[in-house]
Amino acid sequence: MAKCGSCGPGYKSPLDAMKGPREEIVYLPCIYRSTGINKPDYLATVDVDPKSPSYSQVIHRLPMPNVNDELHHSGWNTCSSCYGDSSKVRNKLILPCLISSRIYVVDVGSDPRAPRIHKTVEPYEVFWKCGLANPHTSHCLGCGEIMISSLGDPCGNGKGGFVLLDGETFEVKGNWEVEGESAQFGYDFWYQPRHNVMISTEWGAPKAFALGFKMEDVQAGHYGHSLNVWDWTEHRLVQTIDLGKDGLIPLEIRFLHNPDADQGLVGCALSSSIFRFYKEKDGKWAAEKVIQVPSKKVEGWPMPEMPGLITDILISLDDRFLYFSNWLHGDIRQYDITDTRNPKLVGQIFLGGSIQRGGPVTVLEDKELECQPDPVTVKGKIIPGGPQMIQLSLDGKRIYVTSSLYSIWDKQFYPDLLKEGAVMLQIDVDTKKGGLKLNPNFLVDFGKEPDGPVLAHEIRYPGGDCTSDIWI
């Protein structure tokens, strides 16, 4: 989205982005894999303009040409990292498929309200050219290429490498990393060129998580617990930071948006902790735990203690607030991170989860709550599942949230979600003193989709957002 005759996509700076227009539509993948409905996953377009007659409704569905892909995350062909290049246009959404290893390129430029398939990258191209599989996070690079992280090799073993796509033809160019430099596991990544660094995170071996979560797989070393530090210029793995038992399964990673910043935050799902990572005086990188969500002692659940399971985090464009979701406990939290070493909890809201009152789980010991939260009802619907993917408006005043994590894990931890479908909700944010409040007028009920209940995951704005765009 150009702002002048001589500039490229996105915004000049994160603070400029905060002044961008209010979101009117969003894109999000909807997943049928594991639900028992043999239909393709699809990209949904949702109207989020309160002035529109189709507000909080799905206005378009783009089915993929195959079944059982497991659409998951998405990225752009170009973004604010190419702001200085007026020849670049943000008009293609990149959709890596977590299980099939396909990569779909979707044209959202010709008609933003009715996207269409532009190209399909078949799995064998990723397998043969890169030796990788299970693509996850897609980021556009300042050079015009597209970089996609991988979780494994074609045999289902863990392998943290990166696929490069040509930004014009969308052909697989090969690996970003130097040959032999892959990490043990992969997941998310964020780059900060002014410090010549990229840091990637670790979920686990696809052959482990693909069949459901087992604590024995964690104990057997099939899940990650490290941050991998890469030399951005030389494409080499130069350091691995072991987060230990307090940093099991580090997923979403965010540098501060200021391109000069030498620090950021990462959410560790299983340990339910937030680590701050930072550059030391000698140029090495280090990490320290700054937030810990206590587990709850429970009965009526597969394990005696229930972690929060931090599955998504994001940072506001002014680098003032951190938000994250506890998928199992059922809450979203807002922290003031003016002092990144000492985050301050300023907002919290419960939206379903596994510990709500009246459910099968009884909390025996809770270090935070005096009683179990009540179920949440929006427009007459009791919200199933727990809050998972979150997206913040450019101005920081609205959060959109969906409830699906990954179809097999949804089936394991929230089986009713497959019967009722996911939901998309909207939260109003107090950006002055902190605070989160549910918007009672917004509900997208994916249980009422034409082909049956569906799972909905990551949310994207057409003009970019605080998790898609990186400033260099």
UniProtKB/Swiss-Prot annotation:
It is found in: Nucleus; Cytoplasm, Cytosol; Membrane. Pfam families: SBP56 (PF05694). InterPro entries: Se-bd, WD40/YVTN_repeat-like_dom_sf. Its EC number is 1.8.3.4. One of its GO terms (cellular component) is membrane. It catalyses: methanethiol + O2 + H2O = hydrogen sulfide + formaldehyde + H2O2 + H(+). GO terms for molecular function: methanethiol oxidase activity; selenium binding. Keywords: Cytoplasm, Membrane, Nucleus, Oxidoreductase, Protein transport, Selenium, Transport. Pathway: Organosulfur degradation. It is a peripheral membrane protein. It comes from the Eukaryota. GO terms for biological process: protein transport. PANTHER family: METHANETHIOL OXIDASE. Catalyzes the oxidation of methanethiol, an organosulfur compound known to be produced in substantial amounts by gut bacteria. Selenium-binding protein which may be involved in the sensing of reactive xenobiotics in the cytoplasm. May be involved in intra-Golgi protein transport. Belongs to the selenium-binding protein family. This is Methanethiol oxidase. It comes from Xenopus laevis (African clawed frog).
